[in-house]
Amino acid sequence: MKTFTAKPETVKREWFVVDAAGQTLGRLATEIATRLRGKHKPEYTPHVDTGDYIVVINAEQVRVTGAKSSDKMYYSHSGFPGGIKEINFEKLIAKAPERVIETAVKGMLPKNPLGRDMYRKLKVYAGAAHPHTAQQPQELKI
């Protein structure tokens, strides 16, 4: 019996909406990354993007445990000497709450062109409203 390999043109993708309100950041991000990769499906194939689309709402209400809200740091670099910038979780969640979830999920995806395609299927919104109602996303309980 030959090993089954999913073909990109036969992959059936679904849309899911996840409410991040009150969820722990890491536990939420691992479940989202698993579904973006398609590892929850029986037809998962490592070299084919078999994942679903994920819409995350209420990103501003995601939480972290312990003292991470003041201790967890996010770094960025301008590319110029001395151009490193750092911001903690508290300030980033106030400034750009979408980036917190996007950064956590992106770090859990492959670092190659296939991983970038998977990352494009993630849509994160700070509030409860999102523009993807036409896709009729199903609610995903995490």
Swiss-Prot record:
A GO biological process held by the record: translation
SUPFAM superfamilies the record matches: Ribosomal protein L13
Sorted UniProt keywords: Ribonucleoprotein, Ribosomal protein
GO CC entries: cytosolic large ribosomal subunit
Record carries keyword Zinc: no
Gene3D superfamilies: Ribosomal protein L13
Pfam families attached to this UniProt entry: Ribosomal_L13
Domain of life of the organism encoding this protein: Bacteria
Keyword presence, Chaperone: no
GO molecular function: mRNA binding; structural constituent of ribosome
InterPro entries the UniProt entry points to: Ribosomal_uL13, Ribosomal_uL13_bac-type, Ribosomal_uL13_CS, Ribosomal_uL13_sf
Subunit note: Part of the 50S ribosomal subunit.
Protein family membership: Belongs to the universal ribosomal protein uL13 family.
UniProt function note: This protein is one of the early assembly proteins of the 50S ribosomal subunit, although it is not seen to bind rRNA by itself. It is important during the early stages of 50S assembly.
Protein name, entry field: Large ribosomal subunit protein uL13
Highest classification ranks of the organism: Bacteria, Pseudomonadati, Pseudomonadota, Gammaproteobacteria, Pseudomonadales
